[in-house]
């Protein structure tokens, strides 16, 4: 490792400790754009850096969008107009971050990937950031982002099924986020539940073969898969019940459910 690369990695770790994630991104982007393969540690640092800056803005967008809906429902048009302008500012930041990550992935990281594990990691990341774009965009832009996300998740899944065991944390994390994509973006609870259950059942059947170092990561993601299955199943039952009783209650219930859980770390033991 060259001194400049070593320094960038060290500064990224320092920025993470200081919770200065924009600077963490800046340093890891230098490493990622070097056209050399990233180590497991380096790609995890890159993922964590971007996940933190995108995560904060996704949370902000959800909060602001919720307030906007409430103001509109109260007929407060002046406040709603101000909020809309503020929401657009957050969306511009989200868009810039997503396109920045996707550019690094498509120009540098995916072409340089040689192992099945690294390809799954980067295609999953590509699927994630196109999914984040699809969360707040509309019309043709949203459709294109959703199509690109689906394509990336499918590419990652094909490689994962061929090259990684069912209990592998990366394969499980991919399935977790792919199922969230089906539920949230494609509005397909059936596909989401089918994928989550299939992957969970396959992993359960091979749990005994898990190495000690992967056990904690794998079982944590399996728990998240099960939590989402429980959430989505109860949502479906509640919505069906609400629709049978009162259409207005059904409409309200569809907007009042907890966020499904995603894979928040991409750490894989070397």
From Swiss-Prot:
> Annotated region Disordered: where?
240-270
Q: Do you know which Pfam families this protein is assigned to?
A: 14-3-3 (PF00244)
Any one of the GO CC terms:
nucleus
Disulfide pairs?
Answer: none
GO MF annotation terms: protein sequestering activity
Could you list this entry's UniProt keywords, alphabetically sorted: Cell cycle, Cytoplasm, DNA damage, Phosphoprotein
Q: Where in the cell is it found?
A: Cytoplasm
Compositional bias, Basic and acidic residues, is annotated for 254-270
Q: Which GO terms describe its biological process?
A: mitotic G2 DNA damage checkpoint signaling; pericentric heterochromatin formation; protein localization; signal transduction; subtelomeric heterochromatin formation
Task: Provide the positions where the record notes the PTM Phosphoserine.
Answer: 234, 253
Subunit-level organization: Interacts with rad24. Interacts with byr2.
The Swiss-Prot or TrEMBL record describes its family as follows: Belongs to the 14-3-3 family.
What the protein does comes down to:
Acts in cell cycle and stress checkpoint signaling by sequestering signal transducers regulated by the checkpoints. Required for the DNA damage checkpoint that ensures that DNA damage is repaired before mitosis is attempted. Sequesters byr2 in the cytoplasm to prevent its translocation to the plasma membrane.
**Protein name, per record:** Checkpoint signal transducer rad25
Q: Which organism is it from?
A: Schizosaccharomyces pombe (strain 972 / ATCC 24843)
